Amino acid sequence: MSQLTLYHNGPSTCSQKVRLILELKGLEYESKLIDLMSGEQHDSEYIKLNPNHVVPTLVVNENALIESSLINEFLEDAYPEIKARPSNPEKLHQMRLWVKYIDSYHPQCGPLLMVLG
């Protein structure tokens, strides 16, 4: 089984997306909180993992994966036992629209997700 380490921040919308899929799939992972307010995402060791200076980063067997939606796609492909992605083509299209919307507007969606959560 792969060793998963998630570098993330609690209120970060992008981090929430990845944690949601990890929890839905019941995957065990090591949690490493990154303090964005203190600028921890700019530390030289973190930049080696994520040159974009953002969260989340998922390290899988020493390989760093970045970009929350792409991390979730990886998790769906690598751990297919519990499906997060619908198999119905129309529902899959709807899911992809929501992912695109959140990826495009996530700074504005953060407070909305907090209220809905």
Language-model-detected regions and their locations in the chain:
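GST-like domain detector, emphasizing the conserved glutathione-binding G-site
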Residues: 1-117
